[in-house]
Amino acid sequence: MWGHNRRAAVCTWQGDVWIVEGLDLPKGKLSWRRIATGMFQPLGLKIVNETIYVCCRDQITRLHDANDDGEIDFYENFNNDHQVTEHFHEFAMDLQTDAEGNFYFAKAARHAKDGLVPHHGSIIKVSKDGSKSWRIANGFRAPNGVTVNGDGTFFASDQEGHWIPKNRINLIKQDGFYGYMGSYVPGRDPE
């Protein structure tokens, strides 16, 4: 939440971003306003210096309201380094920043199929300016959340499925592999 009236920005899987206002009122009516639409399955959102960034399945999008009318006029491709195929399960989830302003998100693997692109089942780091990205760790089936701590450590969850019976939370280490063989690439990933 941000701003004087404690408003929130919310994204939906259907491709919309909404602003919710009135959250600071003890009782009363919330106001919902759709400000952006047409994005590819956005499942992560981060506000940095009053600018909304949205993590979509195909890219991180920076939203611009050029004429201050409360609706987005320009959808900027901030970074689209991560690759995606047509498979239904390849969600890109969450969007967090570290103390230096770099972005982090989780990229799901192909459900019950081997990975086709290097980003399947990975945690991705994107530079503050959006010019480059790195795969931090992989071995995830459906990572559905990332938490970045002030000390630089971070965690990511992974959803249960046919390979693990419960959701779990992982302390993420650089170049770590977290067990889901559908995102394993021989010669790249640790034995």
Which residues fall in each region the model found?
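Beta-propeller domains with acidic blade repeats across secreted/periplasmic ectodomains
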Residues: M1-E191
